[in-house]
Amino acid sequence: MLILYIIGGILILPVIYNLLFPLKKPELNNYFKTGQTYTSTGEGITQKILRQEGNKVFCELTLAPHAAGPPEHMHEHMHETISVVSGTLNYKLNGKEEQVGAGGRINFPAGAYHKMWNTTNNEVVLRSEKPEDFVPVEFVYSLDQLYPLMQSNGLTLKMFAKICVLDELFDSVPVGPPPVFFRIIKKVVKPYARIFGVKP
């Protein structure tokens, strides 16, 4: 019985905390400047801001030679499209591996697990070239917050706490846990992370 009370308390606290102390989302209008860059050395990716139009951000991604790229993941609400400007990119979409070269296009639909990486000795450059290639500003902001943690600490508890506090701003679900389970875990961990000073 005591264990049930403890579990109940752990699950109820997030609800109470979020009602009493609602999280204020960051103000992201005109947040990014043209030419601004941020890098994930662990993934071998540098992103450069081309422009921000309201809540839409257009970027250029450069994958270093032999870049591992991000872990396999999917976006529940975001479609990801981008053009290959130079180099040859390897990617995986719903379990199937492919390659695409300069002049090609990538389309990762919402809900589709995917990954991209570079197996060559040359850089691969991807760019938002069409109107539909925008990335939601909340997602780009989340990457801007997470990349320094990945750079210095790798996949640590601190980084996971940050992901939980960012919550729906960071529309990314790693391969493995069911999306609904991942959402619940983030909701449970978020108030505890906020108590310890983690901010979005």
What residue spans do the PLM features occupy?
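Jelly-roll (double-stranded beta-helix
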Residues: M1-T46, L50-K56, A67-E72, E76-M78, ...
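Short, well-ordered beta-strand segments enriched in hydrophobic/aromatic residues
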Residues: V57-L63
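Structured binding elements
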Residues: I82
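A cytosolic small-molecule/anion-sensing beta-strand core signal
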Residues: V85-S86
